[in-house]
Amino acid sequence: MTAFTNRLQQHFYNSFKSEVSLHCSEVLTQGLQEPSLVSSNALLAKQLGIDPGELTSPEMLQIMSGNQIPESSQPIALVYSGHQFGVWAGQLGDGRAITLGELAVGENATLWDIQLKGAGPTPYSRFADGRAVLRSSIREYLCSEAMHGLGIATTRALCLIDSKTPVYREEVESGATVCRVAESHIRFGSFEHFHYRQQPEAIKALA
């Protein structure tokens, strides 16, 4: 077991679930068949205190593909509401993103979310399959790092995983996962959700 894998197994924080449980739902990941590492972000790994070489380990591949849930993880999907195409759409939520937990980083022990996109359906998937395909995952992986390089606040991608899992879109494509990392995945719609439900205490808890 690598040092980073041990951190994931033993030292995940789950503060969002424990402190603002109304804002999320428990969920389990659904793994990918025959996962393989496409790319890993060495610069981000170092920022998180991770040896970049650890991202290539078999244990890490199983976690980042959703095949194994770390012992200390309590996976969740976040609920939010908002507008789509200029129209109020009501409740939305993480339809294909699952937050595994938070890691303490640096001397100040800043908590960073570790989230998998494409690891299966959640209570907010509606009629979708909760999957991501390699084509769009490559785009997110590259664009998020480009935005970061331009100084635009964004989530970042730690690694990109391909697989033999078939995902049905306009044609059959290969399923993939992106490991997203951010200090928070709370968005404006997280507050809107409880504003329109007239639950001010939930808004205060989130703030």
Regions found by a protein language model. Give the residues of each.
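Conserved ATP-binding subdomain of kinase catalytic cores across diverse folds
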Residues: 34-37, 43-55, 59, 65-207
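TRNA-binding/sensing appendages of the translation machinery
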Residues: 1-64
